Amino acid sequence: GVYNILEACRHSYDNGETGVEHLVYASSSSVYGTNKKIPYSTDDKVDNPVSLYAATKKSNELMAHAYSKLYNIPSTGLRFFTVYGPAGRPDMAYFGFTNKLREGKTIQIFNYGNCKRDFTYVDDIVEGVVRVMQHAPEKQNGEDGLPIPPYKVYNIGNNSPENLLDFVTILQEELIAAKVLP
């Protein structure tokens, strides 16, 4: 996966070629794991992933940073926050919640629903990606004359976390209004 992409980027400079101008890759808000501080910041510690998915996203960030440092490849990681919209992933909570409501089954909610999620519409994700693509991290040297890795990480979300119980209530109301539920 990402290792092969990074290797391709590295070798794009072979034989005096111009090479990759800017690698932009998808990461995830899942890297924040059990962090309690809200809002999340890219400066927050993300060393304790709570899933294999989060661990792979964090390892991708570490590899991209290493390649930026070792090979001076401009790279930017984008931590997406719960993306929704047309053609959304069927494993996302809102699809699962909708299916459970349609089947008359109970939705299992942890922590009494006292958690918040930042839902981000896919068009906003696309806008963020396009903006970042146009602005690669600058290649520059530090005071010691050595290159500073041209590497950045950004959070891409809507900056308005929703309470999970409120989300389920609104989902149910909208499904009733749309006559999907009785």
Segments from the language model and where they lie:
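A glycine/serine/threonine-rich, flexible loop-to-helix segment
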Residues: 38-39, 90-98
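Short, solvent-exposed loop/turn segments at secondary-structure boundaries
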Residues: 52, 87-90
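C-terminal substrate-binding subdomain of Rossmann-fold SDR/epimerase-dehydratase oxidoreductases
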Residues: 99-182
